[in-house]
Structures are given as structure tokens and as C-alpha cells.
Amino acid sequence: MSPETVDLEMRLLAGEPIYVGDIPIKPLNLRQISQLGYSKFQQSINIISMTLDEMIESIDDFEIQARLKAEKHLYKVFDMYMLSNGMQELVLKSFNLLFQTENVIIDGELLDDMSVVIDGKYVINRDNFDDVVSMIQLQNNPEKSASDEDDYNPANELAKSIAEKLKRSKEIVEKSKALESDGDGLTIPDIISAVSAMSNSLNKLNIWDLTIYQLYDEFARLTKIDNYRLQIQASMWSPDIEIEHWSEPI
């Protein structure tokens, strides 16, 4: 793991802002997300997470769609958001929520010059939009960054490395789900309840200070500890069992 990746993971674990250039991307904690509404929160992330192919396929005019497919190499995802007033409005509302500010505007008239300006000083454009979205996904949406492997395209190697860890965390969650449920996916409330019940320091009162990244990391680690204990017990009857220590990287 590179020093840069370690630094990024430290900030994710600490719940601190991650910077894309001079833009601070601060994760919301569970309490803030609960107050906003988890579904609304996830919808805001999903809106800005569309791929270029998804954007083109969503266009009803087949002639325009065919032309955009032929010229796809000329465009970035940000350009597609800026081509439509309706999509511009959705992007503004998403950034309103995710950056917790009403001061979000579209600046510029020509496509190449258009940008989203937050609080009058933070500029998101076609050059850094992918990086901003990638970091928001890593902080707040492990389901997207870890499970949609074919569609998820991290904007840089640091994000890719952390996304791999999130994928492993998600796999641990899925294994636990397979053992304990009837096949329905674990929900965020399920994970919050499980962590607050298993943890020695977190409870129903203070768990809301965690970010989603911290919650998933805590759940994955607690699950590894539980699995380690089971492996130790099983090794008494079957010495061939390979024991993975709970402190091993997730």
C-alpha cells in the first residue's frame, strides 16, 4: 500500500474531509443522513454517479443519441450533465445536499467553460468532476463503490485501492448476511443495530457520529473478530483449519 493510499484511508477512517484540489469533501455522519433521509441521500449520490454510456442511453432522441455515441470520445460525463437544463437542476440539488449548502450555481454559457461553483469559491468542472464524485462515493456509498465493480471506475489509483478494500468489506458483510438472513440484503439500519450490539464502545446513542465508511469498516472488523473466534474453536477438532487473525487487513 502506497503512502498516499495510507493517508487517504486514514482520513476516511477519521471522518475528515478529503481534498480534490482545494475542494474539501466532508462526509456526513449517520445522524445527518438520518435527518435528511437515507433514500434521499443515496439518490443524490446516484444522480451524480451516472456513467457516460448511461447518460447517452437516457436520451430519447435516437438521432442525437446515435451522434453522441459516435462522438463519445469527445465528451466527459460532466459535459452530459451540462447539456440539459433538467440534469443541471438535478446536479445542483445533489450538491446542495452532499455539500450541505444552498450556495451552488452553474457558471458559464459555453459547454467547455461551464462549471458548478460551490459557496462562491469551489469550482467543479469537466476536469475534476470525476475525482469529486469518486471521493464522495468512497466516503458515503460503499454499496456503489464496492459492489458495482463493472460500472465503477475510480478516477485515480488512490480511489481504486480504497475501493478494493471496500469491496472486501462488502464481501465480509455479504458472507455474514448469507449465514444470518433469509437472502434479503442487510440494510443500513441492520448494520447500525448489529454494530451497536457487538461493539464494546459504540451504542445506540453514539453510533450516529460515525460516517458510513466508518460504520462499514467497524462492522467488517467485528465480523472478522467473530470469525477468528469460531476458527479457534473449530481448530480444536480439525487442526487443518487455516486461521486468519482478526487484525489482518480487510
Spans of model-derived segments:
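Long, intrinsically disordered, low-complexity Ser/Thr/Pro-rich regulatory/activation regions
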Residues: 234-250
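An amphipathic, hydrophobic-aromatic interaction surface with interspersed Lys/Arg
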Residues: 1-67, 137-231
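Phosphate/adenylate-binding glycine loop and adjacent helical scaffold
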Residues: 38, 42-97, 126-129
